[in-house]
Amino acid sequence: MGESQPVKTFDALFDELTERARTRPEGSGTVAALDGGVHGLGKKILEEAGEVWLAAEHESDEALAEEISQLLYWTQVLMIARGLSPDDVYRKL
C-alpha cells in the first residue's frame, strides 16, 4: 500500500502562513503575494474559485480536492493580508 501524506489542518496551514508573513523568507511565494496586496489576492481567489467549479463539473474527486486546497491557501493569505484570524471566520460559521 502507498504511504499517506500527513494531514495539514486549516489552523496548521494558517500558522505556517502567518510565520512566513512574519519571517519573510527570501523567495517565498506567500510573501510575494502579500506584497502584491489585496487586489491581486482577490483576483487569485476568483481564479481559484473558478477552477474549483470546473473541477467539480469535469474532473476527479482528487483534482477537485487539489483545487479546493488551493482556494483555501489563497483565502488564508488574504485573511493574513487583512489581519483576520481563523477565529474571526469561525465566529461567522
UniProtKB/Swiss-Prot annotation:
EC class: hydrolase
Question: Which GO terms of type biological process are on file?
Answer: L-histidine biosynthetic process
Major localisation: cytoplasm
Keyword Flavoprotein tagged = no
User: Care to name a GO molecular-function term for this sequence?
Assistant: phosphoribosyl-ATP diphosphatase activity
Reactions performed catalytically:
1-(5-phospho-beta-D-ribosyl)-ATP + H2O = 1-(5-phospho-beta-D-ribosyl)-5'-AMP + diphosphate + H(+)
Q: Where is this protein localized, as stated in its record?
A: Cytoplasm
Listed EC numbers: 3.6.1.31
Its UniProt pathway annotation is: Amino-acid biosynthesis; L-histidine biosynthesis; L-histidine from 5-phospho-alpha-D-ribose 1-diphosphate: step 2/9
Instruction: List cellular component terms (GO).
Output: cytoplasm
Checking InterPro entries in the record gives: HisE (IPR008179), PRib-ATP_PPHydrolase-like (IPR021130)
NCBIfam families attached here?
A: histidine_hisI (TIGR03188), PRK00400.1-1 (NF001610)
Q: Which PANTHER family match?
A: HISTIDINE BIOSYNTHESIS BIFUNCTIONAL PROTEIN, HISTIDINE BIOSYNTHESIS BIFUNCTIONAL PROTEIN HIS7
Question: What family name appears in the similarity comment?
Answer: Belongs to the PRA-PH family.
Q: What is this protein called?
A: Phosphoribosyl-ATP pyrophosphatase
What is the name of the gene encoding this protein?
hisE
